[in-house]
Amino acid sequence: MRYRTFGRTGWQVSEIGYGMWGMGGWTGSDDEESLKALDRAIALGCNFFDTAWAYGQGRSETLLGQTLRAHKGVTAYVATKIPPKNMKWPGKAEYLVEDTYPPDHIREFTEKSLGFLGLQTIDLQQFHVWSDAWADDDRWQRAVDDLKREGLVRSVGISVNRWEATNVLRALKTGLIDSVQVVYNIFDQAPEDELLPYCQANNIAVIARVPFDEGSLTGTLTADSTWPDGDWRNLYFNRDHLTATLTRLDRLSPLVPEGMDLPELALRFILEHPAVSTTIPGMRRPAHVERNLVASDGIRLPPRLGDALKTHRWNRGPNATP
């Protein structure tokens, strides 16, 4: 495992971290298997774990806390997230701060997460949704400053809305935000335009999430793919989006080098960018851990391949242009 500096915090974090969205009772997860996967990740050098209260209403945090207690003495960095008070995803400018992140709510859910994790301090507390319409509101600013001063959190980050990579820049300019978590993968390259350069220039850590585009870049997506009732991928991969995704995968697959599979290529693409501090694939089984962590070996992609992957950028979202 290789490590990178996590922005201004100075932490040395594993460049492949652990995304825990799939744990805590979501998408058919199994607690025993999840714990085995977490154990295996620690054994292989993973030390950055990203969870949230919303992942099973504390269940994912509980599993992580249980794992950390079983590995006392191991350096591990814990990142979690505060849900918006109105429990609406994504964040929108029309929502007021009192409806999303009033000070008492920020404190309440920080204390809840500390309880589920069994910790006295959270390394990285993040806003789970965001709109830059809230950036200059001093209520959330004072709240996070108080949490830092009291030692309840060490640093503060923002999880950026999907396909809205610039909808955080005003918040970053306050100087209060230590990290951003953003969707960044072979298809979703928009963060390279403004966000990643800004973070690199200002020593702000970058957590690249959704490295496999919700599963399309695992190489297992087909026209017949189905998911359990209630799994949000049924909405994400609706008929039109599924068809478009499969078409793009057909064009991408010839670029996968011999001896490498698509998931490994997807991770290596992300790690090519120097602004990225860590990427957080979801890993519910030990086999997932072993498959993903192999990409952290310092081997660079050939420049010609990197250039070819750039052509697979897919601008998506409400304001996207082809």
Where are these regions (language model features)?
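N-terminal binding-site loop/beta-alpha segment at the start of enzyme catalytic domains
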Residues: M1-A76
